[in-house]
């Protein structure tokens, strides 16, 4: 699931993913966060 959060590194996405999908799992792709539910 892509969320509307800009990123430069995957670690920036973990707190955002935790807030969005309840799980701190994801990575930075093309400058945006992708979360794994």
From Swiss-Prot:
Q: Which residues does the annotation list for site: Aromatic residue of the functional dyad? A: 36
Q: Which UniProt keywords apply?
A: Disulfide bond, Ion channel impairing toxin, Neurotoxin, Potassium channel impairing toxin, Secreted, Toxin, Voltage-gated potassium channel impairing toxin
Q: Where is this region: Interaction with Ca(2+)-activated K(+) channels?
A: 26-33
- InterPro entries tied to this protein: Scorpion_toxin-like_sf, Scorpion_toxinS_K_inh
A biological process from GO: envenomation resulting in negative regulation of voltage-gated potassium channel activity in another organism
Q: From the record, give the cysteines joined by S-S bonds.
A: 7-28, 13-33, 17-35
User: Where is this protein primarily located?
Assistant: secreted
Q: Which GO terms describe its molecular function?
A: potassium channel inhibitor activity; toxin activity
Q: Which Gene3D superfamilies match?
A: Knottin, scorpion toxin-like
- Localisation per UniProt entry: Secreted
Q: Does the keyword Transcription apply?
A: no
Name the tissues where it is expressed. Expressed by the venom gland.
Where along the sequence does the record put site: Basic residue of the functional dyad? 27
Among Pfam families, the record links this protein to:
Toxin_2
What GO cellular component term, any one, is given?
extracellular region
Record's comment describing the protein's domains? Has the structural arrangement of an alpha-helix connected to antiparallel beta-sheets by disulfide bonds (CS-alpha/beta).
Q: What does this protein do?
A: Reversible blocker of both Shaker B potassium channels (high affinity), and Kv1.3/KCNA3 potassium channels of human T lymphocytes (low affinity).
Q: Which family does it belong to?
A: Belongs to the short scorpion toxin superfamily. Potassium channel inhibitor family. Alpha-KTx 04 subfamily.
Its protein name is Potassium channel toxin alpha-KTx 4.4
| Protein source organism | Tityus obscurus (Amazonian scorpion)
